[in-house]
């Protein structure tokens, strides 16, 4: 059962008061040390690490996560170990250290794959792919995105499918593979429509418009931008002014 300090930390976290949440989770860590409960200490340190990460206090967050990892390895909790490795990878991502982030993500893949935690593996492979892009490992990024799609399909993660298809489409586009980029971005658009995610749909359509523009397919480019402008208006997206200017310029060419 969570301690009173942990419960207070959770309350303040839900209220968005991260400073108070951090204070109470620090108290929870001290309580857990006093009671010599490894599981309680792991939980409290994990919560504290998460709050520190949200506060962009990266060094104390890493200290928490590393101690959590030691405890989880003692407890032999594979799924928890994988989650903490992902948290460490995310920290390195946030601090612009893609090589270290990649190393943590790869270790998490090795940990979670035998456990068949498909939902976590889908998200993890997407995270890994983004680091491969930062490291200019395009082929490795494409492979990781494709692996992510397989896991998203297994568990029916529509959000994951939509986002990953969009990311993979952008990767193919930047790599000069227009045909595969178009297929992925159309898939992304379909999934975003299914989810009712207008901003996501607009993002995929903007990339498609760029693709059609490079290809010289004026009609398809205009059609994509027409829909983007409609979404911009509906959701009051900040890209509206830029999108409408581009759309109107293209219409004048017709």
PLM segments and residue spans:
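Terminal, low-structured helical/coil segments at or just beyond the last alpha-helical repeat
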Residues: 232-254
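Conserved alpha-helical positions within TPR/SEL1-like repeat arrays
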Residues: 3-14, 39-54, 79-94, 119-134, ...
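TPR/TPR-like (Sel1-like) alpha-helical repeat modules
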Residues: 213-237
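Structural signature of alpha-solenoid helical repeat scaffolds
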Residues: 36, 76, 116, 156, ...
